[in-house]
Structures are given as structure tokens and as C-alpha cells.
Amino acid sequence: MTEVEEPEQPTTINEEYDLWVSNVPMMYDFVSETRLTWPSLTVQWLPTEMQPREVDGQQLLRQELLIGTLTTDNEPNYLKIAAIDLPENVTSSKPSVSDDAKENELSHRQSKIKIVRKFKHEQEVTRARYMPQSPNIIATLNGAGIVYIFDRNIKEKDHGAIASFSYHKENGYGLAFNPTVSGQLLSASDDGTVALWDVTSTANKSPSQTFDVHTDIVNDCKWHEFQSSLFGTVSEDNTLIIHDTNSDRAIQKLSVSSAFNTLAFSKRSENLLAAAGTDSNVYLYDLRRLQKPLHSMAGHEDSVTSLEFSPHQDGLLTSSGSDRRIIMWDLFNIGAEQQPDDAYDGVPELFMMHGGHRSPVNEFSHNSNVPWLMCSVEEENVLQIWKPANKIVRPPQPPADFDITTLE
């Protein structure tokens, strides 16, 4: 009798994680994993002085980041500032040590984070962002759509928010400080509204402007990196809208077949915009011709949850997803020729895939001080800090004749 081959069983999440752990010495210069008491829906590196200090004969550099809590009804919530002490060789651009040496040193690199400050917070922290012009000022958004402002300069223990702003009627996940105008803060809500606040005037509790152009949940809002009055929003009403604070009307509107969850404006090219959402693809757009994407990138297997352009490397875009993956995309490799074996691993612009999470990724952040240093949080209480190995990360360099607008 002919033997019937049993179908190959799919790899379990824990088996995938074990495989990732086995590859850490080859793929990373640093990995730290911390199980938090409560999940954090948000994470962002804080700008920190690059001044190493000696601890037990080792030069360490402290970096700090923002996280929040999502607790049960009976437990208090907090905005937290976490810190991690990194070895000097992790924060420099020196060549990676050999794989054998890294395997021996890896246990010493598993630095755990420490909570160095926490602020009482009403309800869960859905988003937390620092003000670029004054990083001690931190804004949060909670489960009721209320915006809170905190000041790190106030040192009293158990100090709470210095101001709160109420306009939204529901939960929200969109929160963004204007990178070019101090004190301007956008918030977006599940009630379909977007509000603009002046956080330098805490006596005024009303928004400076409101934008009611969406007909469903607003998933995200982001400022343009160069033009101070422009920002974008994406919504469950299947639209991406470009707004101008000088007008109450949308200046551009794109309708799509499936909703975008997130968007990001390029920090280097003023016309480049990325957006992604429920169909798992990442789309690139030219603001001058918004109605048709320049290019779409496939790599995620579930909804994309967040997007961010690198503050250091031109052409590097990062995305996270409900598929437990974080992908770094090298836009300069779009259209590059591939060998058949390489094509099996993904499209040519898929630069690196971080597979260390075991549940959907809520958010991630690029460190503004240390190139390639990342932090990310997942649904199951885990915070990871990681840096790809120097031997595999090379600043993406565009060909001399490369033009992002020719990708149509």
C-alpha cells in the first residue's frame, strides 16, 4: 500500500520565536526583552544626552523612552519613563564583533529597562508623544479621547498632568506634535474628529481648530515634515485626507478600497508620503499626484499598525503589523534585480524583518540619537529594544539616477 504523506504542520508562534532567538547573534548587535506588568499601547524614544558613564569598569550610555499602561478597571494607569543603560559599542558605529564573540557576550547585553519616573494617568494611555521643541513636555491621549499634558521638569513624586483638553467624545489613537511649530498638537478620535491644540496656552481649554471631514473613526494623524501648516489623516471611512490649518476644508482627498491605519511623511523628500492599513500592503504616494500610488510593498501578512521614516537613513521606512512583524524597507532597492533564491525571501526593497514578537505589534520607535536602535511594544506586555548588526546595515545609497517619482 502506498504511504500517504502527512501534511506539514504549520510552525507555531513559540517555534517561530525559538528560531528567531537562535538567529539573534547573527542578526543583531543588541537585543533586550522586558515583560511589563501591563501592556503598553504606545512607545517613543526620548531625546537623551549622549554622555557615557562608567559602571563597574564599563562605559554605559543611558537612553530613555515613553511607555504607558493598559490596566484592568481596578488598577491605576500611568505614563512611564523607562531607561536602559547600553554598552558603548552598541551606541557607536564600530564594526560588529564576531558571531562567536557575540554568542559569549549576549547574556551581558540583555539589559533590562528600569522605570525611572511615572505619572498618574486617567484611564489607559493610548498614545504618548514629547514636544520636539521642548522634550520635557509630554502629551498623552486616553480611552475617553482626553488630551493630557505633563511636564518632566516638575520633580514632585506622584505629580500628575499640568493640563487637560477635552473635545473628543470617544477613544483615540492619533496624536502628533508639529515638528516645526512649537506647541501645536493634533489629536484624532474614534468619533471622526480631529482637533488642533495650542499646549503653550493651558488656560484655553478649547481647540484652536477642529476638522470634521471624516465620516468614521480617524485612525491616525501626522504633520508634514517641511510645510508647517500641512497634515494628513487616515480613517475607517476609507479615505486619506491632506489638511491645511489655513483652511477648514480638505485640500486633497484620496479614496481607497480598504482603510488605512497609519501614515508617515518623509523626513527627506517633501512630496513623499507612505500609508498602510488593513490590506497589509505599504503604499508610497507623491503629494503632487495623490490619486495613484507610486508603488506598493508586500511583506506583512496582516494589518499594518504603524509607519515611521528613519530620522537617520534616507530612503529607510519601517512598518509594524498585527502579524507580529516589523519590516524595514529600503526604498532605493525598489525595482532592483533579484536572483530566484533571493525572491523567495521577499521583494528587493524588504531590507530586514524583525520577528521577535509573539503577539501583534502596537507601536515602535526609531532612536533619534543612535542610528538603527529601535524599541517596540506588543499586545502581550512585552517591550523589546534592538539594534540590527552593523555588518548587515549599511546606509541605503540611491543610484545616481534614482527618482522616487518614476516608480509608477
UniProtKB/Swiss-Prot annotation:
List, in alphabetical order, the GO biological process terms annotated in this UniProt record: chromatin organization
Q: Where is this region: Interaction with the histone H4 N-terminus?
A: 341-345
**Annotated site, Important for interaction with HAT1, chain positions:** 272
Q: Name one GO cellular component term.
A: cytoplasm
Q: Which residues form a coiled coil?
A: none
Against InterPro entries, the record matches this protein to: G-protein_beta_WD-40_rep, Histone-bd_RBBP4-like_N, WD40/YVTN_repeat-like_dom_sf, WD40_repeat_CS, WD40_repeat_dom_sf, WD40_rpt, WD_repeat_RBAP46/RBAP48/MSI1
**Does Cytoplasm appear among the keywords?**
yes
Described purpose of this protein according to its UniProt entry: Regulatory subunit of the histone acetylase B (HAT-B) complex. The complex acetylates 'Lys-12' of histone H4 which is required for telomeric silencing.
This one is known as: Histone acetyltransferase type B subunit 2
Q: Which organism is it from?
A: Kluyveromyces lactis (strain ATCC 8585 / CBS 2359 / DSM 70799 / NBRC 1267 / NRRL Y-1140 / WM37)
